[in-house]
């Protein structure tokens, strides 16, 4: 399972002249950091764009998904079950189908080749998932906690902000991580909606090294290594919260 990671690291340290050796070296005999120097020289703007889009997606997703999940879990509006079904179906729509629909809409709105356009597009994937996670988690919050807040005079908004959100840390971390990783690794929306713009994320920046007659594989793999680090670090740091957030609501007392 870890072989692709090992091979990615191996190729990122292999000199260009050794790329076509047959059989290939299992370890780089003459390691070089040329690929990583290329990343620092060429890819930092793309990494910055990916970070901006990822954080923007997280913020927009939380702003929309947390209140919606609270409403479905605690306020139980009319048609809430149907809305949950719609959100589930939305998760099944292929990304390329949504990208083609977004292209026409964004063309009319002037959102093509913009970072905020990609934030909106990526959020359409993260928000339905976030609503389902928040709904499941907030359904498990003891009703006595909500009732106590109401007795103390808190309205619906105050209860949500001061009581429900503070105890929903696991769900917030889970949804934030999913939204960030989706936006960070997205290629379909980026290539369709921002293929020729100045705000290209790292998933498109890697193509800087690929041409008809030239493939700088050590730079490509070095870029992949650097781009994988934020995702790996976040997963390691947040795995405890993710496990709790995903399983919340699955087991009832």
Which residues does each predicted region cover?
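A structural signal for multi-pass alpha-helical bundles of membrane permease subunits
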Residues: 1-253
